[in-house]
Curated annotation (Swiss-Prot):
Methyltransferase able to catalyze the transfer of a methyl group from methylcobalamin (methylCbl) to tetrahydrofolate (THF) in vitro, to generate methyl-THF and cob(I)alamin. In vivo, the methyl group probably comes from the adjacently encoded methylated corrinoid protein DSY3155. The methyl group may then be ultimately converted to carbon dioxide, and its oxidation would also provide reducing equivalents for anaerobic respiration. Thus, may function in the pathway that allows anaerobic methylotrophic growth of D.hafniense using glycine betaine. It comes from Desulfitobacterium hafniense (strain Y51). GO terms for biological process: methylation; one-carbon metabolic process. NCBIfam families: PRK00979.1-1, PRK00979.1-4. InterPro entries: Dihydropteroate_synth-like_sf (IPR011005), MeTrfase_MtrH/MtxH (IPR023467). This is [methyl-Co(III) glycine betaine-specific corrinoid protein]--tetrahydrofolate methyltransferase. Its EC number is 2.1.1.378. The gene is mtgA. Gene3D superfamilies: Dihydropteroate synthase-like. Pfam families: MtrH (PF02007).
Amino acid sequence: MFKFTAQQHVYDINGVKVGGQPGEYPTVLIGSIFYRGHKIVSDGQKGIFDKDAAKALLDQEAELSAETGNPFIIDVLGESVEALTKYVEFILENTTAPFLLDSISPDVRVGALKNLGKDPEIQKRLIYNSIEEHYTEEELAAIKEAGLKTAVILAFSKKALKPNARIDLLQGKDDKEGLIAAAKRAGIEQFLVDPGVLDVASNSWTTEAINVVKEQFGYPGGCAPSNAVYLWKKMRSKGTPFFEVAGAAVFTYPITQGADFILYGPMMNAPWVYRAIATTDAMIAYNNKLTGVKMGTTEHPLLKIF
């Protein structure tokens, strides 16, 4: 394994540590809930859902985290302002975990942010997902008004697929403002950099970009290979356990190259994802007997899964 030469930023998001050298802290796992097509949601516009089923998913996540040592963040998705607001309120009441405020629509994210107000509890736990190349000044203003300090920075564009091009999105090029500078204008102080994943094969380019981000800037880096995995029709057609084994390889590869967090998709897949990630984390941490990097927590997979 290796050590990054840049000083690594380690953020504490309501008790969840993310960042650092390979093996220093466990990988943070981010599972999705209330996504489009999620069976526990009966009305995605009004935010009507099965609360018992949602609570069971949250409880399972907490149990797996306690078993493996991998901390978790909840990816809360919503199709409308009303729905996303209701989902966040449920999360606030039923877990102490940090969460991503997530929607494919920036208007939905901003609307929900305005509904939630400047609650100190929300400010500690809410991670804006995400600030990306098409951000608007209204969006940045809403983030600043809400007093948020943490955001996912999506350094991805179909015009910037190679790793170095994604770095240009982060730091800016010529007269184009970089995403980090834009995020700072919105009051963001903690940056979770996600270079984006186009498909399974190019997860290697994403991983290279994460490595460069950590080497040059020291920001926590990670990605969301889940969409690419679930769109992999040829492998999905083979069914379980073949799909899960292949998925585990896709999710763990970035970690071997320094990634700090993984968005793994639907929370129902947590049982196999946690075990795969924890095993990888343990091996990396053991190798640090050679690199000299000390574990930053006693709640580490190396100390829990064997």
